[in-house]
Amino acid sequence: MKKHLIVNGCSFTEILSAHKSWSEWLVDKLPGYSLSSSALGSQGNGLISRGIIYEVSTKLKNGVDPKDILVGVQWSGSDRMDFLLDDNQLQQAKLDRSKGMWDSNPDTNWDGWMENPTGFIPSQPKKWVISNLGWKLAKDFYMKWHSPQFGSVMTLEHILRTQWFLERNNINYFLFASYSSLKYY
């Protein structure tokens, strides 16, 4: 029976780039495994967690035995946030890729490789906006509402939610952080 390596993370895990990510090296060493990745450069830990839970749930609903699933999660920086917007908010935010890239469009944060807004369910509209500390898009949020402590608490909650889900479903997993972002736990 086919086995599944399901991974998620940020650019360090993303498999769309020119470099070979750790997950591609790992699946080469795991005979009989296929690789499923929803990693995306700059995405935060909320979308990483949700993407893993969605992908594992889909495999289980399709009859895959939990023992045939291995999950690898690379946690991103705790200052990376994601927000689910409705159609009106997306329109107000003017998040329109056709308007151009970072330098020519102050309302966006793309530099040519990032998908924003994005999503983790392939059949659903992409309404999750990812943001980072240095992006113009989220400048007000980070100045007024974000702190390193908040980022650490949110990251720990995403980690726990993911662990609890995987353990409840008897899924083998490994987790690691690519940044030393949990300074305040």
Predicted region positions:
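Serine-esterase "nucleophile elbow" of acetyl-processing enzymes
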Residues: 1-55
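Alpha-helical cap/lid subdomain in secreted, periplasmic
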Residues: 54-185
